């Protein structure tokens, strides 16, 4: 197999350059006995974050964990990856500037769904994001709390902010801006926005109809649903597999991988909409 066209890592800013290139080489080496003998296609799989699973023609994304099989040599890997794993930060970064043909198709299918990972783990908690606003424009100080709650931090470039999870950038803020709306418009596929605000938050018609971005109405006993971690927001995430209902989605993203109630490893969550 010829050497693949290596590209720089497009999303994981907390991994060293040496490790990034090491990952590329490891992915390349995994394809030695791949059943599709087409160097250009295999190179595209490698560049798009995939390694061979050694089961049929199935490959797994190193960034979101999705496993995809039933490839064709003429598949546009960028399209397949972004379509079958729409919240993968790596896939979206690569595909965002692509112009895909309207009649593009694929026979590829998902064997196992992935789980996206964030770009800036150290900024997963709102308090860590709030701490980045020391040099934020004074005229926009009133926005900083809500911007941090919406998953963004100050990049120290003017009024530019970036999402800790998807790394999308938002700038040119106005005092009356809604940070959640600005974030969702910048990247409708941001996994963090979808998890916290609900699927379809960017759809203005649906937002007007169901108002998923509105805070849940208060009701008697709401204090009992207070997040056990931040003691501020309402709980809205059931942790799996332990099924403890103890945290809000904001704090879920900042967990150390264990349930704060029982310390069991957390594999996933169920989003709860409290009304």
UniProtKB/Swiss-Prot annotation:
Ranges of the BIR repeats in the UniProt entry: 24-91, 126-193
InterPro entries: BIR_rpt (IPR001370), IAP (IPR050784), Znf_RING (IPR001841), Znf_RING/FYVE/PHD (IPR013083)
Keyword entries, A-Z: Apoptosis, Metal-binding, Repeat, Zinc, Zinc-finger
Keyword Zinc assigned: yes
Domain of life from the UniProt record: Viruses
GO function term, MF aspect, one: zinc ion binding
Amino-acid positions noted as binding Zn(2+) in the UniProt annotation, renumbered to this chain: 163, 166, 183, 190
SUPFAM superfamilies reported in the protein's UniProt record: Inhibitor of apoptosis (IAP) repeat
Pfam families: BIR, zf-C3HC4_3
Known function: Acts by blocking cellular apoptosis rather than by preventing viral stimulation of apoptosis.
PANTHER family documented for this protein: INHIBITOR OF APOPTOSIS
Name the UniProt record assigns to this protein: Apoptosis inhibitor 1
Provenance organism: Orgyia pseudotsugata multicapsid polyhedrosis virus
Organism ancestry: Viruses, Viruses incertae sedis, Naldaviricetes, Lefavirales, Baculoviridae
């Amino acid at each position: 197999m010829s050497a693949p066209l290596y590209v720089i890592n497009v999303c994981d800013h907390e991994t060293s350059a040496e490790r990034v290139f090491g990952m590329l080489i490891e992915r390349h080496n995994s394809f030695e006995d791949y059943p599709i003998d087409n160097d250009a296609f295999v190179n595209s799989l490698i560049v798009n974050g995939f390694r061979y699973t050694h089961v049929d023609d199935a490959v797994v994304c190193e960034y979101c964990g999705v496993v995809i099989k039933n490839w064709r040599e003429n598949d546009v890997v960028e399209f397949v990856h972004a379509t079958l794993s729409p919240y993968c930060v790596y896939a979206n970064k690569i595909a965002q500037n692509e112009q895909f043909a309207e009649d593009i198709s694929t026979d590829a299918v998902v064997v196992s769904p992935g789980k996206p990972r964030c770009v800036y783990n150290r900024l997963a908690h709102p308090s860590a994001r709030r701490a980045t606003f020391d040099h934020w424009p004074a005229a926009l100080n009133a926005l900083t709390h809500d911007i941090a709650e919406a998953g963004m931090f100050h990049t120290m470039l003017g009024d530019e902010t970036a999402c800790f999870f998807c790394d999308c950038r938002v700038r040119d803020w106005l005092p009356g801006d809604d940070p959640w709306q600005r974030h969702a418009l910048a990247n409708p596929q941001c996994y963090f926005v979808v998890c916290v605000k609900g699927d379809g938050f960017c759809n203005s018609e649906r937002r007007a109809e169901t108002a998923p971005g509105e805070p849940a109405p208060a009701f008697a006993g709401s204090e009992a649903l207070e997040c056990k971690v931040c003691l501020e927001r309402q709980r809205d995430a059931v942790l799996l597999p332990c099924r403890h209902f103890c945290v809000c989605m904001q704090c879920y993203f900042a967990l150390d991988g264990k349930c704060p109630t029982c310390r069991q490893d957390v594999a996933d969550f169920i989003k709860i909409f409290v009304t």
